[in-house]
Amino acid sequence: MAFRKSNVYLSLVNSYIIDSPQPSSINYWWNMGSLLGLCLVIQIVTGIFMAMHYSSNIELAFSSVEHIMRDVHNGYILRYLHANGASFFFMVMFMHMAKGLYYGSYRSPRVTLWNVGVIIFILTIATAFLGYCCVYGQMSHWGATVITNLFSAIPFVGNDIVSWLWGGFSVSNPTIQRFFALHYLVPFIIAAMVIMHLMALHIHGSSNPLGITGNLDRIPMHSYFIFKDLVTVFLFMLILALFVFYSPNTLGHPDNYIPGNPLVTPASIVPEWYLLPFYAILRSIPDKLLGVITMFAAILVLLVLPFTDRSVVRGNTFKVLSKFFFFIFVFNFVLLGQIGACHVEVPYVLMGQIATFIYFAYFLIIVPVISTIENVLFYIGRVNK
């Protein structure tokens, strides 16, 4: 027996990335998982090295980031890799989730796999927000103020929760210090959840574009899919390097190069681009409490998909109606992101409300109705044969 199979530790590696049987029909959309693993490693490694030079004291936080940029050897590469790496992390994560939605990866028997993925998504959003606050520029300070103030919408105990989060009466030194501590901790929790994600994947294996069982035609992970993954890894590294070295601030906000000042409110307070769709959903509801509930529901609604999709066929590969409404949903999500970056004024308020309705309607109305209609059409087509 090969040593990689007999050794208790290497046998785990072997069963996941060497001899793991994969459906022969999977396409490049299945490469997003390996890219997400690469992104997580980049973020953790660059974050650890940056933490060696960063100070979480509110008087020193902004200056310590500039110290990393100016004085630390290759510090600017660390900072720009970390900042742009976060944006690319979310780009790939959105594509990974879109693949799951399109190909029905949330369907039984992979419901646990999907649910763990949603938890990873929530933890990643929290980590990104905490890290954005650690820079303590203008947008960091006011972003922290706005988002933490959302908890004040909770009846009776909301204001106490906000004061507890702040560690005082406003965003101050205790806030940034505890945010940094959590920002350092949560990525390791994400790494643990990724291991759980892989364990859940290993039970039933990967799905495939055809939506049928792949047990009849599987090939080993190595060397076929390892080299296939390397194609997108090198392409990803090339595009990331172009941003890091030639356009490092394109995905950021210029106001965050101004030290945080609680006495000066920016013209517009917007989060990073990857949180804009959920920010638009929050702002589309006039009532504060309902807005907060709706924003969190926009993420948690992903958990109901395994139950609202009633189709007898997994995925949208052979379903024309489902394809059409899926791309409507994608367009609507991009539109929400654009609206989230706009001021709260006519016509963006009404557009945001319509887009929010379409977002929830897709999961709760469109998917169950269309899947039922397609089931009837499949049945009619089979009977007529």
UniProtKB/Swiss-Prot annotation:
<feature type="topological domain" description="Mitochondrial matrix">
    <location>
        <begin position="365"/>
        <end position="385"/>
    </location>
</feature>
<feature type="binding site" description="axial binding residue">
    <location>
        <position position="197"/>
    </location>
    <ligand>
        <name>heme b b566</name>
    </ligand>
</feature>
<feature type="transmembrane region" description="Helical">
    <location>
        <begin position="75"/>
        <end position="102"/>
    </location>
</feature>
<keyword id="KW-0249">Electron transport</keyword>
<feature type="topological domain" description="Mitochondrial matrix">
    <location>
        <begin position="1"/>
        <end position="27"/>
    </location>
</feature>
<dbReference type="GO" id="GO:0045275">
    <property type="term" value="C:respiratory chain complex III"/>
</dbReference>
<keyword id="KW-1278">Translocase</keyword>
<dbReference type="InterPro" id="IPR030689">
    <property type="entry name" value="Cytochrome_b"/>
</dbReference>
<dbReference type="GO" id="GO:0009060">
    <property type="term" value="P:aerobic respiration"/>
</dbReference>
<dbReference type="InterPro" id="IPR005797">
    <property type="entry name" value="Cyt_b/b6_N"/>
</dbReference>
<feature type="transmembrane region" description="Helical">
    <location>
        <begin position="28"/>
        <end position="51"/>
    </location>
</feature>
<feature type="topological domain" description="Mitochondrial matrix">
    <location>
        <begin position="205"/>
        <end position="223"/>
    </location>
</feature>
<keyword id="KW-0679">Respiratory chain</keyword>
<comment type="subunit">
    <text>Component of the ubiquinol-cytochrome c oxidoreductase (cytochrome b-c1 complex, complex III, CIII), a multisubunit enzyme composed of 10 subunits. The complex is composed of 3 respiratory subunits cytochrome b (COB), cytochrome c1 (CYT1) and Rieske protein (RIP1), 2 core protein subunits COR1 and QCR2, and 5 low-molecular weight protein subunits QCR6, QCR7, QCR8, QCR9 and QCR10.</text>
</comment>
<comment type="similarity">
    <text>Belongs to the cytochrome b family.</text>
</comment>
<dbReference type="InterPro" id="IPR048259">
    <property type="entry name" value="Cytochrome_b_N_euk/bac"/>
</dbReference>
<dbReference type="GO" id="GO:0005739">
    <property type="term" value="C:mitochondrion"/>
</dbReference>
<keyword id="KW-0472">Membrane</keyword>
<dbReference type="GO" id="GO:0006122">
    <property type="term" value="P:mitochondrial electron transport, ubiquinol to cytochrome c"/>
</dbReference>
<comment type="function">
    <text>Component of the ubiquinol-cytochrome c oxidoreductase, a multisubunit transmembrane complex that is part of the mitochondrial electron transport chain which drives oxidative phosphorylation.</text>
</comment>
<dbReference type="InterPro" id="IPR016174">
    <property type="entry name" value="Di-haem_cyt_TM"/>
</dbReference>
<feature type="transmembrane region" description="Helical">
    <location>
        <begin position="288"/>
        <end position="308"/>
    </location>
</feature>
<dbReference type="InterPro" id="IPR027387">
    <property type="entry name" value="Cytb/b6-like_sf"/>
</dbReference>
<feature type="topological domain" description="Mitochondrial matrix">
    <location>
        <begin position="309"/>
        <end position="319"/>
    </location>
</feature>
<feature type="transmembrane region" description="Helical">
    <location>
        <begin position="111"/>
        <end position="135"/>
    </location>
</feature>
<dbReference type="GO" id="GO:0005743">
    <property type="term" value="C:mitochondrial inner membrane"/>
</dbReference>
<feature type="transmembrane region" description="Helical">
    <location>
        <begin position="320"/>
        <end position="340"/>
    </location>
</feature>
<keyword id="KW-0496">Mitochondrion</keyword>
<feature type="topological domain" description="Mitochondrial intermembrane">
    <location>
        <begin position="52"/>
        <end position="74"/>
    </location>
</feature>
<keyword id="KW-1133">Transmembrane helix</keyword>
<dbReference type="GO" id="GO:0008121">
    <property type="term" value="F:ubiquinol-cytochrome-c reductase activity"/>
</dbReference>
<keyword id="KW-0479">Metal-binding</keyword>
<feature type="topological domain" description="Mitochondrial matrix">
    <location>
        <begin position="103"/>
        <end position="110"/>
    </location>
</feature>
<feature type="topological domain" description="Mitochondrial intermembrane">
    <location>
        <begin position="136"/>
        <end position="172"/>
    </location>
</feature>
<keyword id="KW-0830">Ubiquinone</keyword>
<dbReference type="InterPro" id="IPR005798">
    <property type="entry name" value="Cyt_b/b6_C"/>
</dbReference>
<dbReference type="GO" id="GO:0016020">
    <property type="term" value="C:membrane"/>
</dbReference>
<feature type="transmembrane region" description="Helical">
    <location>
        <begin position="224"/>
        <end position="246"/>
    </location>
</feature>
<dbReference type="Pfam" id="PF00032">
    <property type="entry name" value="Cytochrom_B_C"/>
</dbReference>
<protein>
    <recommendedName>
        <fullName>Cytochrome b</fullName>
        <ecNumber>7.1.1.8</ecNumber>
    </recommendedName>
</protein>
<feature type="binding site" description="axial binding residue">
    <location>
        <position position="183"/>
    </location>
    <ligand>
        <name>heme b b562</name>
    </ligand>
</feature>
<dbReference type="GO" id="GO:0046872">
    <property type="term" value="F:metal ion binding"/>
</dbReference>
